[in-house]
């Protein structure tokens, strides 16, 4: 394990986080929950004039439900308004349990119970587990007939307004081995790519080109997918080689040159040595690389070898004798367990994405504290 080096004081500006937001931005929250994952995405305003949220994993109780309450109090989402028959209002458009390890679903039962009037859909990979957290989670889902329940695999796409969620893993090949336990539970993970604004057919010109491709941004949420699963992803989502054919130009116009490129990467498996490889990070080529882990971690995360390969993918030094990597923060690598030099924790982070730009905010919370939006500080680098 290599604990993150404290970030120099003075690298964050105290500003009004809520006032800085505009309705057309996507906001990704990565919560400081120690060894685990809890994530929330605030979507851009939809044609009906409302903002919805997506929740991906809930490691602990309290933190994510409290964040939902804070977003409502700040006027960023509306109050729950279920239908007369108990149908949810869909303001929580989707909840994802990426896989059934407790450090990803330990707070899921509480969340499903508290936010029942809001939740429209629920996804998990369909990997049966015997832990009480998993059984409690599934009991909550099965007791709510109004929630749409799905077990998607690689290639599945779902639009939420202007945001497109693509499932990268598990592959169908891995999914078909679940029932025999021929797939390790981490490799059952639902890893996701979220793109916005994602163009549909009417968002193209006469030549089928995206009207404003430069404004499109993506983030990849790696869950706990390991190298076996990523090997399937690298095959299922190929990089386009140079080709001047009309078909190739049409594909490039629609998707870009790489189906795995992303502005933001939430590193899989807490930056373990099994969670990422060099080719994967080079393919994604993120401007921001985020890691959810504790300090100290009970599992020894992040692993040194994973940190080094991420740094090498972002700043190649292997062929230059004597060259050393820049500090992680200068490479856009941030950890939920980051601290400030001579100060306290930097804590949970939000990445505000829009108009081709991504801005990082920190909230200074510990693992046991809720996120206070008024404490937001913007990373200035």
Regions inferred by a protein language model and the residue ranges of each:
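Short, charged, surface-exposed secondary-structure boundary motifs
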Residues: 65-67, 130-136, 298-303
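Flexible, acidic/histidine-containing loops and adjacent segments that form or flank the divalent-metal
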Residues: 1-28, 33-34, 44-47, 73-94, ...
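Short hydrophobic-acidic sequence motifs that mark active-site Asp/Glu residues
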Residues: 40, 53-55, 191, 218-220, ...
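Catalytic metal-binding/acid-base residues of hydrolase active sites
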Residues: 34, 59-61, 101, 128, ...
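Active-site metal-binding motif and surrounding structural segment of the metallo-beta-lactamase
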Residues: 44-54, 59-124, 252-272, 285-289
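Alpha-helical scaffolding within the catalytic cores
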Residues: 35-39, 66-67, 106, 246-251, ...
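Long, structured stretches of catalytic cores involved in phosphate-ester chemistry, encompassing
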Residues: 249-348
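Acidic/histidine-rich helix-loop elements
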Residues: 58-69, 176-180, 236-246, 269-273, ...
């Amino acid at each position: 394990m290599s604990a993150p080096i404290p970030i120099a004081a003075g690298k964050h500006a105290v500003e009004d986080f809520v006032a800085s937001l505009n309705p057309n931005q996507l906001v990704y929250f990565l919560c400081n929950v120690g060894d685990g994952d809890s994530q929330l995405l605030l979507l851009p305003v939809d044609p009906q004039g409302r903002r919805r949220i997506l929740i991906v994993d809930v490691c602990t109780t309290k933190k994510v439900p409290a964040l939902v309450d804070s977003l409502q109090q700040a006027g960023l989402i509306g109050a729950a308004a279920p239908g007369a028959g108990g149908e949810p209002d869909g303001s929580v458009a989707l909840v994802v349990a990426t896989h059934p390890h407790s450090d990803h679903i330990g707070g899921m039962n509480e969340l499903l119970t508290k936010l029942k009037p809001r939740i429209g859909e629920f996804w998990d990979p369909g990997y049966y587990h015997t832990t009480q957290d998993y059984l409690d989670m599934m009991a909550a889902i099965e007791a709510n007939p109004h929630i749409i329940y799905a077990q998607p695999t690689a290639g599945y796409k779902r639009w939420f307004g202007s945001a497109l969620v693509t499932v990268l893993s598990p592959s169908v090949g891995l999914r078909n081995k679940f029932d025999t336990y021929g797939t390790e539970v981490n490799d059952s993970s639902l890893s996701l790519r979220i793109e916005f604004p994602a163009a549909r057919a009417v968002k193209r010109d006469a030549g089928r080109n995206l009207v404003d491709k430069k404004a499109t941004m993506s983030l990849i949420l790696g869950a706990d997918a390991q190298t076996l699963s990523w090997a399937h992803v690298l095959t299922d989502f190929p990089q386009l080689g140079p080709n001047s054919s009309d078909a190739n130009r049409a594909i490039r116009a629609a998707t870009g040159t790489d189906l795995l490129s992303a502005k933001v990467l939430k590193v899989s498996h807490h930056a373990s040595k099994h969670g990422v490889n060099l080719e994967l990070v080079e393919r994604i080529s993120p401007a921001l690389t985020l890691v959810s882990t504790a300090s100290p971690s009970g599992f020894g995360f992040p692993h040194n070898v994973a940190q080094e390969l991420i740094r090498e993918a972002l700043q190649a030094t292997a062929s230059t004798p004597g060259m050393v990597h820049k500090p992680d923060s200068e490479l856009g690598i941030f950890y939920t367990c980051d601290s400030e030099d001579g100060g306290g924790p930097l804590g949970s982070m939000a990445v505000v994405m829009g108009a081709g730009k991504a801005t990082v905010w920190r909230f200074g919370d510990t693992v046991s504290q809720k996120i206070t939006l008024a404490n937001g500080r913007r990373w200035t680098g």
